[in-house]
From Swiss-Prot:
Its cofactor is Mg(2+). Gene3D superfamilies: 1.10.20.140, P-loop containing nucleotide triphosphate hydrolases. HAMAP family: IPP_trans. The record marks T105, R127 as: Interaction with substrate tRNA. Substrate binds at T16, A17, S18, G19, K20, S21. Monomer. The keyword Transferase applies. This is tRNA dimethylallyltransferase. Belongs to the IPP transferase family. The gene is miaA. Catalyzes the transfer of a dimethylallyl group onto the adenine at position 37 in tRNAs that read codons beginning with uridine, leading to the formation of N6-(dimethylallyl)adenosine (i(6)A). Its EC number is 2.5.1.75. ATP binds at G14, P15, T16, A17, S18, G19, K20, S21. Residues 39-42, 163-167 are annotated as: Interaction with substrate tRNA.
């Protein structure tokens, strides 16, 4: 645990559409704190609606940081987010205030608490080289390369696991060290684990599924089509994270007149429900027992469960 880790932080995790943002705003008002984005898709600009970023009205209710600050033409790693959070927490005007981390990206929460190894960034040149080879040769061929260059980590990976195979090769070429060696290095915590209030929302599955459907229909009505049109106008690489946001492919198909409005909405809703299920499973299996589980944000404030850190 780092000696300068921030004490009395509030962490709010949970699947998409579970009510995290509303809870964070309520807590910010109660504590005088500020909200920090802990979601890997909400960092990207342009897609305000499809990534469910806080609305302008929400932003006016409390200070929000690290939302939409990354251009969609860029990639953004957990390590870069960690650096941005560290810089944010060091700002003079935020000292003594409660940071409220809210989002659905489990690795971000793990990094905050020091549970993620600090693997190095790799250059764009190295990254493009190995990703280009993966696209051209396939996962099985690159797994064979990894077996020769780093047999220990190759033995731990499935030959079909393209993402992890590429990552292992990138790190090996960039640093000369196996990813396994980097993973042994304990991460540095930005948030004090013992004093933090750790909350995970786990709403009723049927309720969440219905809310996801209503929310995507609202996104469509409020301008999701225009967002995707603006994104497509940038002519970006389809492999970029922003281009893989749920709804982009479906709305793009609608704009290309290869999919009806109804089918685009239905497929987006299904994809979002599947994503929420994966998030819930990750939080259930990966978060420690000291994370308190609630069905809703309202439940957090009932019965004196919420503790004002101030």
């Amino acid at each position: 645990m780092s000696e300068d880790a921030v004490k009395n932080a509030i962490l709010i995790a949970g699947p998409t559409a579970s009510g995290k943002s509303a809870l964070a705003i309520r807590m910010a008002k109660a504590t005088g704190g500020f909200i920090v984005n802990t979601d890997s898709m909400q960092v990207y600009g342009v897609l305000d609606l499809l990534t469910a970023r806080p609305s302008r009205a929400n932003l006016a209710e409390a200070e929000h940081f690290l939302y939409g600050h990354v251009p969609p033409s860029s990639t953004y790693s957990t390590g870069k987010w960690f650096e941005d959070v560290e810089a944010l927490l060091g700002r003079c005007e935020l000292q003594g205030r409660v940071p409220i981390f809210v989002g659905g990206t489990g690795l971000y929460f793990r990094a905050l608490l020091g549970g993620l190894s600090q693997t190095p960034e790799v250059s764009a040149q190295v990254r493009d080289h190995w990703r280009g080879r993966m696209e051209a040769e396939g996962a099985k061929a690159l797994h064979a390369v990894l077996c020769v260059r780093d047999p220990a980590i190759a033995a731990a990976l499935q030959p079909s696991d393209s993402q992890r195979i590429v990552r292992a090769l990138e790190v090996l070429e960039s640093t000369g060290k196996s990813l396994l060696e980097w993973q042994k290095v304990k991460g540095r915590a930005l948030v004090d684990d013992q004093s933090a209030q750790k909350i995970v929302l786990r709403p009723d599955r049927a309720w969440l599924g219905e809310r996801i459907a209503r929310r995507f229909s609202a996104m469509w009505a409020e301008g999701a089509i225009d967002e995707v049109r603006a994104l497509l106008a940038l002519d970006l690489d389809p492999a970029l994270p922003a281009m893989k946001a749920i709804g982009v492919r479906e709305v793009s198909a609608f704009l290309a007149e290869t999919m009806s409005r109804e089918e685009a909405i239905e497929r987006s809703v299904i994809a979002t429900r599947q994503y929420a299920k994966r998030q819930s499973t990750w939080f259930r299996n990966q978060l420690g027992e000291d994370w308190r589980v609630y069905a809703s944000g309202e439940e957090v404030f009932q019965g004196g469960s919420f503790r004002d850190p101030q």
